[in-house]
């Protein structure tokens, strides 16, 4: 990735808005992405000259052009203005011609997170962080705020099912983001509200150790604006350790701590207490009580149209954020009842030969365990079959025992080769180490062949879950659409049809 002038732990080099000239140009590489397109509109609304490029003719480019933003298809060095601040994502590498040109010209290069923080300093920025649960929790917050008329802006990693998008520019004061810890970019934000769903060591290829990973979350809490709110999950061991490490609040301007969960609350100012959970296929409800300084301020029932106790817990985090924003909790909790989920979170993609086919983004053992519980409820009297694509060699290596434990709960397991993403292979590490550790299941290296193997093992009434953060999603959709992958060419065509 191109060198970024500011480090991820120090924003001193990113100017305040009044210090950036009103005629400043910004150039966004990858402008068509959901999050980048919203950022482009934000910069444009602030009066800056905005242009950018994307490798493909994305649907968002038409909206950007209609707003008066210059957009190019394809990355070429001559398109980069010589006076621009260039904005990149972690997906932009040094061999990108526009990034290389910006570096050669000595232009400022900002990460998307830095630019988004710059644009949202006048908003109530709500940042949701955690090893898992970020997308669902941030989606719940954005969805409910929209339903009650707060007109929020948001930039989320997944697509909110009812809205068909994961990014939106609204006129309200709230801006909801999913803060990514995988590359440290969440340390670039200055939130008014931080929601931390859990702290379970992950992305050790970047952080190096569990201790460094946990320290990053301590550093994240230090990014909170004066007078802001920390919304912390009391049911997570890592968050409990964090709460002990965050300095005591003293004096005016210190952060408010809002604890949420089913168990014993953390010491803090506000407690969102969940109790009496009842779960069923595709639904769940529980009691909610909110106390501020020991005085009850709200009591009601939370009902969700999605299953799993982990989703009720995520909704508790959303309620904590809503309370921090001063939102009417009765309206907000009613709006949560209309939330139908985020894409790739136990998403029903179709039914074929009386086999229900679901898709889920789960890639860490803890979140997979929660997903499998919800999937088991949905399976009813049918069997639960899983086709899993491990994500990252390092995660697979470090968590092989945990993967084996959680997958012992399924009736039939197929594992394909690792989705490498940003990593180089680790000798001796692939999907087969999971089935070998488990002592059952089938390893099929090619993901299309693995998907077809899993489908052929299913019987009418079964539930087949495609699981993983990589490209396995294409397989589930394609099989649901009737593809059988008789050849590599057909597999490629099936994938193209889902793009």
Report the location of each language-model feature.
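Phosphate-binding loop of NTP-binding sites
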Residues: 17, 42-45, 65, 79-81, ...
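C-terminal helical cap/extension that packs against the catalytic core
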Residues: 403-460
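Short acidic low-complexity segments
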Residues: 70-82, 165, 446-454
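Beta-strand->loop->alpha-helix junctions that form or flank phosphate-binding loops
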Residues: 53-54, 72-75, 110-114, 155-158, ...
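N-terminal leader/targeting and accessory segments in enzymes
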Residues: 1-115, 237, 307, 493, ...
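Nucleotide phosphate-binding/pyrophosphate-handling subdomain across enzymes
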Residues: 19-27, 35, 39-46, 187, ...
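Glycine-centered, small-residue-biased loops immediately flanking beta-strands
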Residues: 228, 382, 462
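Short internal beta-strands
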Residues: 48-55, 229-234, 385-389, 409-420
């Amino acid at each position: 990735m191109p060198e970024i002038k500011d480090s991820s732990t120090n924003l001193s080099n990113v100017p305040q808005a009044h210090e950036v000239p009103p005629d400043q140009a910004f150039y966004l590489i990858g402008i068509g992405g959901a999050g980048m397109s919203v950022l482009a509109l934000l910069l444009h609304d602030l009066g800056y000259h905005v242009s950018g490029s994307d490798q493909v003719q994305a649907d968002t480019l038409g909206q950007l052009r209609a707003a008066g933003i210059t957009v190019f298809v394809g990355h070429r060095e001559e398109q980069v203005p010589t006076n621009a601040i260039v904005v990149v994502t972690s997906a932009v590498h040094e061999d990108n011609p526009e990034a290389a040109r910006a570096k050669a010209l000595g232009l400022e290069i900002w990460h998307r997170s830095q630019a988004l923080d710059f644009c949202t300093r006048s908003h109530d920025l709500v940042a949701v962080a955690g090893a898992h649960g970020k997308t669902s929790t941030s989606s719940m917050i954005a969805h409910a705020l929209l339903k009650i008329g707060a007109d929020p802006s948001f930039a989320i990693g997944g697509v909110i099912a009812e809205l068909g998008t994961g990014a939106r520019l609204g006129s309200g004061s709230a801006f909801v983001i999913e803060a990514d810890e995988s590359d440290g970019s969440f340390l670039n934000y200055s939130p008014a509200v931080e929601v931390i769903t859990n702290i379970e060591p992950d992305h050790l290829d970047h952080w190096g150790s569990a201790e460094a990973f946990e320290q990053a979350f301590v550093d994240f809490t230090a990014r909170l604006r004066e007078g802001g709110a920390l919304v912390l999950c009391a049911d997570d061991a890592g968050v409990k350790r964090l709460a002990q490490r965050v300095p005591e609040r003293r004096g005016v301007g210190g952060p408010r701590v809002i604890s949420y969960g089913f168990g014993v609350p953390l010491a803090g100012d506000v407690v969102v207490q969940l109790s009496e959970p009842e779960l069923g296929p595709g639904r769940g409800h529980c009691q909610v009580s909110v106390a501020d300084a020991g005085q009850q301020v709200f009591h009601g029932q939370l009902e969700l149209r999605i299953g799993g106790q982990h989703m009720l817990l995520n909704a508790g985090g959303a309620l904590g954020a809503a309370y921090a924003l001063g939102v009417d909790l009765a309206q907000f909790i009613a709006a949560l009842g209309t939330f139908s989920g985020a894409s790739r979170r136990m998403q029903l993609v179709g039914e074929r030969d009386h086999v229900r086919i679901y898709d889920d983004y789960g890639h860490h053992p803890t979140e997979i365990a929660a997903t499998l519980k919800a999937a088991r409820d949905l399976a009813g009297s049918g069997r639960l079959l899983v086709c899993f694509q491990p994500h990252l060699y390092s995660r697979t290596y470090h968590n092989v025992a945990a993967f084996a434990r959680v997958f012992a709960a399924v009736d039939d397991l197929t594992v394909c080769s690792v989705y490498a993403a940003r990593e180089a292979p680790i000798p001796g590490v692939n999907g087969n180490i999971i089935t070998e550790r488990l002592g059952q299941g089938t390893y099929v290296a090619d993901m299309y062949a693995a998907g077809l193997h899993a489908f052929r093992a299913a019987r009418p009434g079964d539930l087949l879950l495609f699981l993983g953060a990589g490209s396995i999603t294409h397989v589930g959709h394609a099989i649901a659409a009737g593809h059988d992958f008789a050849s590599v060419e057909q597999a490629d065509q099936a994938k193209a049809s889902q793009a």
